[in-house]
Amino acid sequence: MQYINQSLVSEIRQKFCNVNTCPISGDRIFFENAGGALTLKSALETTTKFASIPDNQGRDNAASKALNDVIKNAKSDLSALFNTQSGEFFMGESGTELLFRLIRNAVLASPSGGSIVGTSLEHPASRSAAKKWSNEMEYTYLSVPHCVKTGTVDPKNYASKISDTTRVVTIVHASPVTGMGTKIKEISKIVRQKAPLAFIIVDGIQHAAHGGIDIESYDIDGYVISPYKMFSRHGFGIAWVSDRLRTAPHEKLDGGPSDNWELGTRDTGAYATMSDVKEYMCWLGKEFTKNNDSREQIKAAGVAIQDYERKMTDTLLHGLDNLKGLADFEDVEIIGGLNNSSREGLVSFRIKDYPSEKIVRYLNNQGIRTHTRKCDHYSENILKPLGWDDCVRVSICHYNTLSEIKKFLSCMAAFRDK
């Protein structure tokens, strides 16, 4: 199999908006992909096209029927993108809102008494919802501790928290602070052995852009993404629910279809952008497989993305040619360590006893966009056990280049020399 090279990266970058330049601040290198990925040009064009159409779905006219077909096609494309053979996709306000909604409905569809199991690695979107509904239902909330050293969760650590009265289990597919992925299939297998009827809800928001989703293999009940972190745009979230959760009691209009999860008129253009994402992944996958099946192309693209981003983060950490990597700088500490196979396109670090926001501000002045994570309600679950007040998050994607990494390392060397 071939891999993404710098020539292909140039072609990839032609597919995206604002690759080199921020429309507000000017030229910049974008290493803030965990905050939101770049948007496909095709997704922007699709959004513009559908934003001007006044018609709604469900009417007896050609435009309305066409909109219905677009949504139907988008759901089929989502099925290929995420590999689902059953269940239902639907749209909501955001990824966070959908996690709250799925967790709420999973809890309300479960027997009284028991527990919800989550992990200290999770984003507050799932942890907050799980804790709220544990209190509402008088459940026990149990948290699986993540490994501070590796920045991820060992699936075996779930075993002691799961019992036959576990009602809901939440899993984060990748952390937006540590940058580490989790082993969904292994965790799910442990859950099913002890609590076969528990609902398993996965936060896929951070993972989605970094190389492959395979829901069919996970044995779960819910999966949520934020499309603006998967090459689409802001303004909506996408959720998948299993048939078991789809048919469970949930919010719906009185007299409407019993298994419908959509609330209100959907943004057809938003759905259509997910077809653009699917087509992009197929286009990329064709570089690595001769198979004409779209799912195989998407899988090939995912493997290539993972490999490329691994090489890029290795360069960030270990350097290249005469450029030192972050690991070579004195007093630099890196979340998850240096050789972590769970890393997904993200490096979080600090310079000991030095404010991270000053580093981020310096890099921003050099035209490199990164982000400060502080010990607040978003990140204290990761930073507090480390004894850190903050960190610098450098988050890349497969459209970033080796020359951009070199510029970052060069700027960090100049910063340290000061």
Regions found by a protein language model. Give the residues of each.
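Pyridoxal 5′-phosphate
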Residues: 1-418
